[in-house]
Amino acid sequence: MAGIGRKIASYVGIVDDRRYDEEDLPDEELTTEVYSDDGYEPSSEVTQLHHHDSNEQHARGHKAVQHRRRSELEEPSIADINRILTVHPRNYNEARTIGEQFREGIPVIMNLTEMDDADAKRLVDFAAGLIFGLRGTIERVTSKVFLLCPRNVNVTPEDKARIASGGFFNQS
């Protein structure tokens, strides 16, 4: 039983466990382990993977697939101002709604004037991560009002001016 008590005391740091202090042992008690040869021999043989170029694939009846970046495939479109979602979150729990709508390609206006500063900062940080991850843009319309645009949507300067001059959003 004393062995268990000593191990616990050593683990907690109450007593020193001198079994592992090499400086306390004489040199003849220090040993080095020698591993036996287990028959392993390094090989210089390289196994080559099958490589097909596009001409070989056509000859075999397979279509050559050209991979394009997603940004090359999606054409930017002008956003309809009626399709912009305006959100007035009162707490951070409403971030999910913002993220889901933005992910669907809908521009989102976040009006954070009704939130306390700590939650507003968290929501702006969330929006910045959302914008970065989905390659969109974020613009500050007024104090505590932000416009989040997906990457395949362009909001015209006229629409931005209308958003900023709308009596509700003009916080300055």
Swiss-Prot record:
Keywords: Cell cycle, Cell division, Cytoplasm, Septation. Residues 18-73 are annotated as: Disordered. Residues 48-59 have a biased composition (Basic and acidic residues). Transmembrane segments: none annotated. Residues 60-70 have a biased composition (Basic residues). InterPro entries: Cell_div_SepF, Cell_div_SepF/SepF-rel, SepF-like_sf. GO terms for cellular component: cytoplasm. Residues 22-40 have a biased composition (Acidic residues). It is found in: Cytoplasm. One of its GO terms (biological process) is FtsZ-dependent cytokinesis. Signal peptide: none annotated. Homodimer. Interacts with FtsZ. HAMAP family: SepF. Cell division protein that is part of the divisome complex and is recruited early to the Z-ring. Probably stimulates Z-ring formation, perhaps through the cross-linking of FtsZ protofilaments. Its function overlaps with FtsA. Belongs to the SepF family. This is Cell division protein SepF.
